From Swiss-Prot:
It catalyses: Thiol-dependent hydrolysis of ester, thioester, amide, peptide and isopeptide bonds formed by the C-terminal Gly of ubiquitin (a 76-residue protein attached to proteins as an intracellular targeting signal). The active site is at residues 288, 828. SUPFAM superfamilies: Cysteine proteinases. Residues 615-650 are annotated as: Disordered. Residues 4-99 form the DUSP domain. The lineage of its organism: Eukaryota, Viridiplantae, Streptophyta, Embryophyta, Tracheophyta. This is Ubiquitin carboxyl-terminal hydrolase 8. Residues 279-869 form the USP domain. PANTHER family: UBIQUITIN CARBOXYL-TERMINAL HYDROLASE (PTHR21646:SF24). It is an enzyme of class 3 (hydrolase).
Length: 871
């Protein structure tokens, strides 16, 4: 479209038009000026339908428009509308004339109007009518449309058949952008306006399009007052550079130009800039974990190109491992919504519903792990988009001494024969797994694919624990002990550390227990249980026991003493638990008398000297006063089901020590242990000792009651730091398999705890790195807060690749981070995304704002997304 000033002479304009090699042109003219020119026309030459369209400024430009050539030089955006829809007011048919309204006229009409306007006289020359109506031409030349969303993404080619008409082209455009047809208009700007549709059933005139024609597509986002526009700011050397940013206050739609050009033009007022893809996701209720992963994937370059194209052609509806394409379609629709012009915030309800349907673990509104969602989504997208319709059977063969390169290529060919999708193309790599049998030294080499690397954090591998060690023969007092164990180790690691710390002789063994409220609540006997089951506030007691060839059962002694409590002014004697339980074996115990003698032997180390005991009769111990404030483990005398308790209280102050059979918690009394009564030695014996006041005074109960916590609460440790390369080296370090993950050795024909070694073999285009900050157990979850120092612009992995298989580069650039703040279960997820130039953005659910590059490296980094650099 060309424009000239209304004040120019018709002759000069004619000469200018002739210089365009005879091509027909369409002109924007100000509507006020056009109305004045119409007034000068002869009435028989004026037809209302000669003004086919109007053009209203779609940007926020509000200045005067005096000269047409100045208008076009300012890169102002216009919306085109039919005259009948936009210009007529009511039944009068009068046009509403505005200083910002324009008419779209043919070159013949433009020349005649200039003459009438300048000469102010009638002309004899007929006016050529210009209309979009007429006979439909149903054929077009073969044409290729190039669609692009941002300059940093590759353009998308859309093939249109020669038999396709303009209606089919219109429908194709609607399908590509997932828009309703009434929200879209197409017209030809190749030299003469011949195609103009407001619905997919409109007819067109003069559809003989040229092969190099350019189709302009306008997308109008209804219900929104703001659009996102981009402009190409001109450099001094004449080249263009795209500027990114968010611009508010612009009305109307965003115009995209599709044609043979590889670049995408976004027209807007000078100084206005914006960008696509900076769209937040609403938090539907603890869905920040999902939003974080989705934003990282939605800004993965190759995936953006793929899902903005005709990806539905690759959906595999028959894959039994897939989800009938529903996850891929839901993700594709969501990604298009995030990249739609004018979008501000998107509510991912449809996607979450699909997710909950196929992955019930993510249903509801509980907090989950963003990496677990990412793993499920990548696997689900792969299966939904798997190009392999019928997977062939392939057998995994061992290397058997063949060259690694040959075996690796064989494994990869077998993998791709069954798994071929955009996810495999972009996100999957391959590592080498070597297993060595510790017995026969058999070596097995396999090559497995990976979607992401889960790296441990080696700097936080040790944990300090405080415990109390008790003798099982009364030979020594309780001993406090501190040991260092692997933070994610097992109970057997704790046992080994205790054996070393105690210098344990061969004839002794250790029993590790957890004590709470003066009773043993747990025996830590399973060697494969995780040490994460032990919390910092727990109290652990270790008993040194003699090894017994007959494996005699244990006998556990719990203690109670009688206290006077005053309730509502009345005295109420109550039994109160105190002290650490004492443990021994039943190997030399036959009757009740032996049970009592063994108990007194275990207490012998707590007996105070005679002179201290005499002095203490006149001055009550501090421990007695302290015990009165502790009400845990109390039993009312009146509530007990022992018939001897009342006799005991009535015979004060001269009672005797009594022993009772009880349960493992010391809550109920089964029977009193009589001295001559035989003891059942077939199972563990739980004994409750009830002490008379006078006899208890001869023992130092303070030593019996003091227990340290595993780790003192409130002590703040300095934050640890580690480099990403150290994490990678820990991942690649040789280590033995666990007892629950043993390998079947083909040489020994037995399951063995083989030595395993991993090596990187083939790296993907998109490298996803998962930092293993979280550990899970049956009872608790832990998070590591260590700061991981990772490179931004140049992650060079060339020194970690076992085989250089012709790949040009092993360098990567960071483009997204999934962050987790806070503790497990109550934390919050966000995403940092690199989006054009050197800009980083913080995606915090529906809030999106720019963040400086210096602030993106934090201890909250959880999943890192890298893209391969091209040399």
């Amino acid at each position: 479209m060309n424009g000239t000033s209304p004040d120019e002479s018709p002759d000069s304009t004619t000469q200018r038009i002739d210089s365009f090699n005879g091509e027909q042109r369409v002109y924007f003219v100000p509507l006020r000026w056009w109305k004045d020119a119409q007034d000068s026309m002869p009435s028989e030459s004026v037809e209302k339908r000669e003004i086919l369209y109007t053009a209203s400024c779609g940007s926020s430009y509000g200045g005067p428009m005096k000269l047409i050539n100045n208008i076009f030089n300012s890169d102002i955006l216009f919306d085109l509308r039919r005259e009948g829809d936009a210009l007529q007011n009511g039944e009068t048919g009068e046009a509403s004339v505005s200083g910002r309204d324009f008419a779209l006229v043919s070159s013949d009409m433009w020349l005649q109007a200039l003459k009438w306007y300048h000469d102010d006289k009638n002309t004899e020359k007929g006016v050529k009518s210009f209309s979009a109506g007429g006979v439909d031409r149903g054929d077009v030349y073969p044409v290729q449309l190039r669609l692009s969303v941002l300059q940093e993404t590759n353009s998308l080619a859309v093939k249109i058949c020669k038999k396709d008409n303009s209606v089919e082209c219109f429908r194709r455009a609607c399908k590509i952008f997932s828009l309703d047809s009434e929200q879209l208009r197409i017209w030809d700007i190749s030299g003469q306006t011949t195609l103009f549709f407001e619905s997919d059933v409109s007819n067109s005139k003069d559809c003989q399009q040229q092969a190099d024609q350019e189709i302009l597509l306008e997308l109008q986002i209804y219900g929104l007052s703001d659009s996102i526009k981009l402009k190409e700011s001109k450099k001094e050397d004449g080249s263009t550079q795209q500027t990114n940013g968010i611009t508010n206050g612009m009305n109307g739609g965003t115009v995209f130009r599709f044609g043979r050009s590889n670049s995408l033009s976004f027209l807007g007022k000078a100084g206005e800039a914006g960008t696509l893809g900076l769209t937040g996701l609403q938090n539907l209720g603890n869905t920040c974990f999902m939003n974080s992963s989705l934003q990282c994937l939605a800004h993965t370059p190759k995936l953006v190109d793929f899902f903005l194209g005709e990806y539905s052609k690759e959906i595999n509806l028959d894959n039994p491992l897939g989800m009938k394409g529903e996850i891929a379609l839901a993700f594709g629709d969501l990604l298009r919504s995030l990249w739609a012009p004018g979008a501000s915030t998107v509510a991912p309800r449809t996607f979450k519903a699909k997710l909950a349907r196929f992955a019930p673990q993510f249903s509801g509104f509980n907090q989950h792990d963003s990496q677990e969602l990412l793993a499920f989504l990548l696997d689900g997208l792969h299966e939904d988009l798997n190009r392999v319709k019928n997977k062939p059977y392939v057998e995994a063969k061992d290397g058997d001494g063949r060259p690694d390169a040959e075996v690796a290529d064989e494994y990869w060919r077998n993998h791709v024969a069954r798994n071929d999708s955009i996810i495999v193309d972009v996100c999957q790599g391959q590592y080498k797994s070597t297993l060595v049998c510790p017995i026969c030294k058999k070596v097995s080499v396999m090559f497995d694919p990976f979607m992401y690397l889960s790296l441990p954090l080696p700097c936080t591998s040790m944990r300090t624990m405080d415990l109390t060690v008790m003798s099982a023969d009364g030979s020594s007092l309780p001993i406090p002990l501190t040991v260092n164990v692997p933070k994610f180790g097992k109970f057997e690691d704790l046992h080994k550390a205790l054996v070393t710390a105690c210098s344990l002789p061969e004839e002794e063994t250790l029993l590790v227990t957890e004590v709470y409220n003066n009773r043993i609540i747990r025996f830590l006997e399973e060697p494969t249980d995780s040490l994460t089951l032990i919390r910092d506030g727990d109290k652990l007691v270790v008993y040194r026991l003699k090894k017994d060839a007959n494996n005699s059962p244990l006998i556990v002694y719990m203690h109670q003493k009688l206290e006077e409590q005053f309730i509502s002014g009345k005295s109420s004697p109550t039994w109160k638990a105190f002290g650490i339980p004492l443990v021994s074996r039943l190997c030399d115990v036959e009757n009740g008398s032996d049970v009592e003698n063994l108990y007194l032997k275990l207490l012998s180390s707590f007996k105070m000297p005679t002179e201290f005991f005499t002095e203490n009769l006149e001055n009550p111990t501090e421990e007695e006063a302290t015990d009165k404030t502790d009400t845990d483990g109390t039993t009312s005398v009146e509530d007990t089901n022992s018939t001897d308790v009342k006799e005991t209280t009535e015979s004060l102050p001269d009672p005797v020590l009594r022993l009772y059979l009880t349960d493992d918690r010391g809550n109920s009394i089964e029977a009193e242990m009589l001295k001559e009564k035989p003891v059942n030695k077939s199972k563990r014996l739980n004994v409750l000792a009830r002490w008379p006041v006078k006899e208890l005074d001869v023992y130092d109960t303070c030593l019996l009651s003091s227990l340290p916590e595993v780790s003192k609460s409130g002590t703040k440790r300095p934050q640890e730091s580690v480099s990403l390369f150290k994490c990678l080296e820990a991942f690649l370090t040789e280590e033995p398999l666990g007892p629950d993950d043993m390998w079947y050795c083909p040489g020994c024909k037995e399951h063995r705890q083989a030595i395993k070694k991993l090596d990187l073999w083939r790296l993907p285009e998109i490298l996803v790195i998962h930092l293993k900050r979280f550990s899970y157990s049956r009872f608790m979850k832990n998070k590591l807060e260590a700061y991981v120092d990772f490179p931004l612009d140049n992650l060079d992995l060339s020194s970690y690749i076992s085989y250089k298989n012709g790949q040009t580069t092993y360098r990567y650039m960071l483009y997204a981070i999934s962050n987790h703040y806070g503790s497990m279960g109550g934390g919050h997820y966000t995403a940092y995304v690199h989006h054009g130039g050197d800009r980083w953005y913080d995606f915090d659910d529906s809030h999106v704002h720019q963040i400086s590059q210096e602030k993106i490296k934090t201890s909250a980094a959880y999943v890192l997304f890298y893209k391969r650099l091209v040399d």
